[in-house]
Amino acid sequence: YPFREVIESNGCKVAANILIRKEDGSYAIDFEDFERQIVEKGVKLFLFCSPHNPVSRVWTKEEVERLGDICLKHHVIIVSDEIHADFVFEGKHQVLVDLKEEYKDITVTCTSPGNTFNLAGLQISNIIIPNAGLRKKFQHQVIVMLQFQNLMELKV
């Protein structure tokens, strides 16, 4: 799971919010620690894995909204990794941007047909950014940092 490596290789610091393992073996979010770290460490961007990989936790609507509200309150951009959304067997996957209109201003949603359709070798994904300002910044970074585009996305 390369989140930490990607963060550090881009000159940023990791503020890890470790999941709480409950007695029944399930996992929960430590919301107090999550918000405390945002405030104390000046977090600007939150990488949210939903459903969680590798623990396969499907977050409830209330949990997702609580995270979203904390991020709204502190002006934190959310990168919502929803690449495993098609593999939910129990519960319902909660799409962050569908829960509240305000979340669209701070959310970058990542999806991919790779896992669902066994196409991981293509190394493609969908990046959905409703906010025009965020989208423009992202497009600029793609051009500056990657300097290469997949032939299938050139038209996009």
Residue ranges: model-predicted function:
Residues 19-91:
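Active-site phosphate-binding strand-loop segment of PLP-dependent enzymes
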Residues 9, 101-156:
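Conserved core segment of the aminotransferase class I/II
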Residues 12, 73-77, 104-105:
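A short helix->loop->beta-strand "cap" motif at the edges of active sites that frequently abuts
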Residues 5-7, 70, 99:
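Hydrophobic/aromatic ligand-binding patch that stacks against planar heteroaromatic rings
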Residues 1-14, 149:
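Substrate-binding/gating loop at the entrance of the active-site cleft, primarily
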Residues 7-12, 30-31, 60-63, 91-95, ...:
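Short, glycine/charged-enriched secondary-structure capping and boundary segments
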Residues 3, 67, 96:
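Aromatic/hydrophobic pocket-lining residues that form π-stacking "cages" and hydrophobic walls in ligand
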